[in-house]
Amino acid sequence: MKIGIIGAMEQEVAILKDKIEGLSTVTKAGCTFYTGTLNGADVVLLQSGIGKVAAAVGTTLLIAEHNVDVVLNTGSAGGFDSSLNLGDVVISTEVRHHDADVTAFGYEMGQMAQQPAAFIADEKLITTAEQALTEMSDKHAVRGLICTGDVFVCTPERQEFIRTHFPSVIAVEMEASAIAQTCHQFNTPFVVVRAISDVADKESPMSFDEFLPLAAQSSSEMVLNMVTLLK
């Protein structure tokens, strides 16, 4: 099995990149692909860039040119579930766009035309993620709906919009739905596993930039454990 791993930013892939053996690097269309073995598994690690378009371009190349069998999306996310704290982990059961609106044509809020309302994560990969979490006894995890938009959600108004239209949302970020939609169109199994860098409605002594390295550590540890189980 060849495992594809996607992170948007350098900070989100650096820990994993440093652990890849036989590393080779290719850059194309603004995306950087790191190929080699990780904990004995064949992997292609993609630094896609931030946002849905960058993520879709990178995921397309990852599947079509690098021929990965499964896709794991790692990195940071903003928590919406009240039980989440900084450094906790979210695992996708489904992923939706929160910034798409073609409801005028009878679609659900967040549903793109001619696409399903939600992109369903692979059940086997979800199970693998939960098994990987058992090696991280200090981390709390929530599984559920992750919502994506080309918006850094930082205002009460946007938070309320998302809660109103997607009441079961557990976390938000800026790439997962594009990755999920691309995987859906290629019929490639995926799961999103991210660490919480900030939580809606909770005060934190640390800023997003300050906590990002810690979130990257948590999400990278999860991915390393998953890769070991999948190889």
UniProtKB/Swiss-Prot annotation:
It catalyses: S-adenosyl-L-homocysteine + H2O = S-(5-deoxy-D-ribos-5-yl)-L-homocysteine + adenine; S-methyl-5'-thioadenosine + H2O = 5-(methylsulfanyl)-D-ribose + adenine; 5'-deoxyadenosine + H2O = 5-deoxy-D-ribose + adenine. One of its GO terms (molecular function) is adenosylhomocysteine nucleosidase activity. Substrate binds at G78, V153, M174, E175. Keywords: Amino-acid biosynthesis, Hydrolase, Methionine biosynthesis. Pathway: Amino-acid biosynthesis; L-methionine biosynthesis via salvage pathway; S-methyl-5-thio-alpha-D-ribose 1-phosphate from S-methyl-5'-thioadenosine (hydrolase route): step 1/2. SUPFAM superfamilies: Purine and uridine phosphorylases. The active site is at E12, D198. Its EC number is 3.2.2.9. GO terms for biological process: L-methionine salvage from methylthioadenosine; L-methionine salvage from S-adenosylmethionine; nucleoside catabolic process. GO terms for cellular component: cytosol. It is an enzyme of class 3 (hydrolase). PANTHER family: 5'-METHYLTHIOADENOSINE/S-ADENOSYLHOMOCYSTEINE NUCLEOSIDASE, 5'-METHYLTHIOADENOSINE_S-ADENOSYLHOMOCYSTEINE NUCLEOSIDASE. Belongs to the PNP/UDP phosphorylase family. MtnN subfamily. Catalyzes the irreversible cleavage of the glycosidic bond in both 5'-methylthioadenosine (MTA) and S-adenosylhomocysteine (SAH/AdoHcy) to adenine and the corresponding thioribose, 5'-methylthioribose and S-ribosylhomocysteine, respectively. Also cleaves 5'-deoxyadenosine, a toxic by-product of radical S-adenosylmethionine (SAM) enzymes, into 5-deoxyribose and adenine. This is 5'-methylthioadenosine/S-adenosylhomocysteine nucleosidase. It comes from Aliivibrio fischeri (strain ATCC 700601 / ES114) (Vibrio fischeri). The lineage of its organism: Bacteria, Pseudomonadati, Pseudomonadota, Gammaproteobacteria, Vibrionales.
